[in-house]
From Swiss-Prot:
This is Beta-fructosidase. NCBIfam families: beta-fruc_BfrA. GO terms for molecular function: beta-fructofuranosidase activity. GO terms for biological process: carbohydrate metabolic process. Optimum temperature is 90-95 degrees Celsius. Highly thermostable. Changing E190A: Loss of activity. It comes from Thermotoga maritima (strain ATCC 43589 / DSM 3109 / JCM 10099 / NBRC 100826 / MSB8). Substrate binds at residues 14-17, 33, 41, 74-75, 92, 137-138, 188-190, 208, 260. The gene is bfrA. Pfam families: Glyco_hydro_32C (PF08244), Glyco_hydro_32N (PF00251). Belongs to the glycosyl hydrolase 32 family. InterPro entries: ConA-like_dom_sf (IPR013320), GH32_Enzymes (IPR051214), Glyco_hydro_32 (IPR001362), Glyco_hydro_32_AS (IPR018053), Glyco_hydro_32_C (IPR013189), Glyco_hydro_32_N (IPR013148), Glyco_hydro_beta-prop_sf (IPR023296). Hydrolysis of sucrose, raffinose, inulin and levan. Specific for the fructose moiety and the beta-anomeric configuration of the glycosidic linkages of its substrates. The enzyme released fructose from sucrose and raffinose, and the fructose polymer inulin is hydrolyzed quantitatively in an exo-type fashion. The active site is at D17.
Length: 432
């Protein structure tokens, strides 16, 4: 009932963070935190999938397993070196059953992108750099100025989130360079990612205090990120652990449509699975602002146009599933409702604010989220509905992502605006 038609999800078991996103030898590889045994967190492995186009995904065998029942292969990244694929990841040992450091950084290698061999010299980073560090995980590695650069999520004394920087010439021997960023609003930072877009260094990171993905944009200079602007990478409730692809000529990011906040309410567990990835998005900088938009490849999902109108009103859609895209262009203000007789999601745009209300979206409930927006002569909202999620993009600039669980088809669409053009496209089921 709730299995997505065009989002990536595990056929069975639990999935969380995307890991090791890489474009390698003409294909997009996505690894992810995975428990193949049951739809709950635990026994964490690295699941693996591959795509030719970022849209149609194929499941592959598990890439990395833990060595012991009390261990886990936690989040990390992938890079290419000498034609081979290298995975850099956090290895976890449950401290209640194991001695020594609970989180260390390790490496695995593959020549074919399918079979991975763990490095005999693991761990390549055996302990945190200083006392008081209570989190030490999620290495994201990129190439910069002729060397490998790793950022790690961390925390200090259960009070402040930190991002640590390491450098290496060979992926096996790492030098600690220091703390490049701190966030006092959270006790730890997870899944950091440092990318450069144009002339800007952009740190993307997740914080446990609000289960959100944030960005800080500025310049990395003399071992510190000098922040010029910061904000949310996504303004919804359910976007987390975002990571960018290695090896692409643009910055493409995927996040986990997270299940932490309302895990017990999610009915997908009854279907034997839990976890959905976001649609792939492109990040870019325009007018000194970090912006986000759906990747162009998603246009290939459109099967047929099921509805269009150039006026306000309430309309019945010819759809059999919650699997469609709405494209709405308008001037000024708008109220857009998508739902059925008992469930709905409401998007409201006033002069300078966009509000999304998912409180009546389905059995798992929801929240109201809002963001300040810049009004344009013609505004555009793209909404992607897919069984158990909805993602909104406004003016190819900001995004809102939510997990929802409607019990019936959203076949009623209501729009109120002075000037509007609205189209609805049925989208392909990539799993058939």
């Amino acid at each position: 009932m709730f299995k997505p038609n065009y989002h990536f999800f595990p056929i069975t078991g639990w999935m969380n963070d995307p890991n090791g996103l890489i474009f390698w030898k003409g294909k997009y590889h996505m690894f992810y935190q995975y428990n193949p045994r049951k739809p709950e967190w635990g026994n964490i492995c690295w699941g693996h999938a591959v795509s030719d186009d970022l849209v149609h995904w194929r499941h592959l065998p598990v890439a990395l397993y833990p060595d012991d029942e009390t261990h886990g292969v936690f989040s990390g990244s992938a890079v290419e070196k000498d034609g081979k694929m290298f995975l850099v990841y956090t290895y976890y040992r449950d401290p209640t059953h194991n001695k020594g450091e609970k989180e260390t950084q390790c490496v695995a290698m593959s020549e074919n992108g399918l079979d991975f061999v763990k490095y005999d010299g693991n761990p390549v980073i055996s302990k945190p750099p200083e006392e008081g560090t209570h989190a030490f995980r999620d290495p994201k590695v990129n190439r910069s100025n002729g060397e490998w650069r790793m950022v790690l999520g961390s925390g200090k004394d259960e009070k402040i989130g930190r991002v640590l920087l390491y450098t290496s010439d060979d992926l096996f021997h790492w030098k600690y360079e220091g703390v490049i960023f701190e966030d006092e609003t959270t006790k730890e930072i997870e899944c950091p990612d440092l990318v450069r877009i144009g002339e800007k260094d952009i740190l993307i990171y997740s914080i446990t205090s609000t289960n959100s993905v944030l960005f800080s944009m500025g310049e990395l200079k003399e071992g510190k990120l000098n922040v010029e602007k910061r904000g949310l990478l996504d303004h919804g409730t359910d976007f987390y652990a975002a990571q960018t692809f290695f090896g692409t000529d643009r910055v493409v990011v995927i996040g986990w449509l997270q299940s932490w906040l309302r895990t017990g309410l999610y009915p997908t567990k009854r279907e034997g699975w839990n976890g959905v990835m976001s649609l792939p998005r492109e990040l870019y900088v325009e007018n000194n602002e970090l912006k986000v938009k759906p990747v162009d490849e998603l246009l290939a999902l459109r099967k047929r146009k099921v509805f269009e109108t150039a006026k306000s009103g309430t309309f019945l859609l010819d759809v059999k599933e919650n699997s469609y895209e709405i494209v709405c262009e308008f001037s000024g203000e708008i109220e857009l409702r998508m739902g059925n007789e008992s469930e709905e999601v409401v998007i409201t745009k006033s002069r300078d604010e966009l509000i999304v209300d998912t409180t009546r979206s389905g059995v798992s409930g929801g929240e109201v989220r809002k963001s300040t927006v810049e009004d344009e002569a013609t505004n555009r909202i793209r909404a992607f509905l897919d069984s158990c999620s909805v993602e909104f993009f406004f003016n190819d600039s900001i995004a809102f992502s939510f997990r929802i669980h409607p019990e019936n088809v959203y076949n009623i669409l209501s729009v109120k605006s002075n000037q509007v053009k609205l189209e609805v496209f049925e989208l392909e089921n990539i799993w058939l």
